[in-house]
Amino acid sequence: FLVSDSTGETLDRIYLALKAQFPNNNYKIHHFAFMRTTTQTATLINACKKTENPIILYTLVEKQTTNHIINECKTYNIPCFGILDYLIPQFEKIFNQKATLKPSGQHELNKEYYRKIEAMQFTLQHDDGQKLDTAVDADIIIMGVSRTSKTPTSIYLGERGYKVSNIPLVLHQKLPDEIFSSEAVKVGLTIDPTRLSDVRKTRMNILNDKQSSTYVDMDVIQNEISEAKKMFVSKKIPVIDVTRKSVEETAASIIKIYEIEKEKKQ
């Protein structure tokens, strides 16, 4: 049972990280979002009592609701774990100030929120080589041949407040010089040719495309990747191999490169 006093997004991510360490356990997930009253906790506990071997994970900051769940769990011998219960008191000591204990604090409509909205709008407008004339205004420019996860990686970064432009590299087509001279941090994505061929074949099958034979031709793919690598080297663009990387891992590597490059310019 994933219990939160807000949307539950934070708890979902924590649970996925935890679940990955125990791949053989297939628990059914029950979401209880916006949990802020004892009436709601009663519904939660009743659901737990009807479930075999229930476990509660929660991110709650309001003490009355939290204490009610803890007491009920003790009564009915239900394991429950508060993700923030240990961290908040420790950070209060470190910062020498009391926590606000305000639910949904991370979702306030503040400057940071609107900055992320602006970043996402920019990223969507500059997807797949669109608006090259303003791509130079990006924080990050991602380049790579077709099907190297440029779009999902860009969107992931956009959600985190980075303005991203992603540009497909096409054989025998040069990019404007302004792209390389811009202040944006440039990152190249590459991939194993065999893996790329498989990805493209899957894409063609989904689209029922029988015509684009060169799109999956191994010689063409190897040439595409080779030319892209040469360009990355000549322009001194750091490269990430996405063959065995998830979008999240690729994005984390890009953020690291971004931070390093920004430090160099300070």
Named regions from a protein language model:
Residues 3-6, 58-63, 244:
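Structural motif
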Residues 1, 74-115, 218-224, 230:
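Ser/Thr/Gly-rich flexible loops in soluble cytosolic domains mediating phosphotransfer, phosphorylation
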Residues 186-223:
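A glycine- and Lys/Arg-enriched "phosphate-lid" helix/loop adjacent to the NTP-binding pocket
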Residues 31-50, 54, 59-60:
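Metallocofactor- and cofactor-centric catalytic cores in central/energy metabolism, strongly enriched
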Residues 117-163:
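Internal active-site segments that recognize and position negatively charged phosphoryl groups
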Residues 153-155, 169-201:
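Redox- and metal-dependent alpha/beta enzyme cores, enriched for Fe-S-associated oxidoreductases
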Residues 123-127, 209-250:
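Small-molecule kinase domains that catalyze NTP-dependent phosphoryl transfer to phosphate-bearing small molecules
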Residues 1-18:
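N-terminal accessory targeting/assembly segments
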